[in-house]
């Protein structure tokens, strides 16, 4: 659940984007080009490839039959700005250490000696690098998720520590839950060559599932801040 401080930040973003006071009343249907142009206008000018973002955002609205009202667009853009500043795969400082600390914590809970953990992480992974090297080089959740996918799938200790479940739980520009995406993938409009987890790390997938989580259900209230509070 969002904290009061974060809700205030999201409210401020709505004001800065010129979205304050917008209501979600159903407008007359608009041409795709008109909606995309509005998305580009509402996005911060510094964001690279705003046209590409607009295309993926519009496609997510259209595929889910969600009305692209100005309020709905503003709500989506506010969350993407707050969560990732419109980065498809945002970097996380100190991520490798965080991951190693979690591995050590789980190993301690399972009474696995540290030297065995270090030995398991010294095994070469499918990329040719050791798991320890890949952990140290990880800069984003996508990097870390790939490490854990391989570690859990190929090293027995990985399965012992994580039970087959990748501990990276969120992804994408809106930081949507991967579990949510996997549970709502039935109508996903794009071809999936790998897994839904991998799709959430793409711009199109991250925005599709993020928009589904934020707007893909009916509510009785009108203010977008209440949707922000529901988005977790």
Model-predicted regions and their roles:
Residues 11:
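Flanking scaffold residues of small Cys/His-coordinated metal-binding clusters
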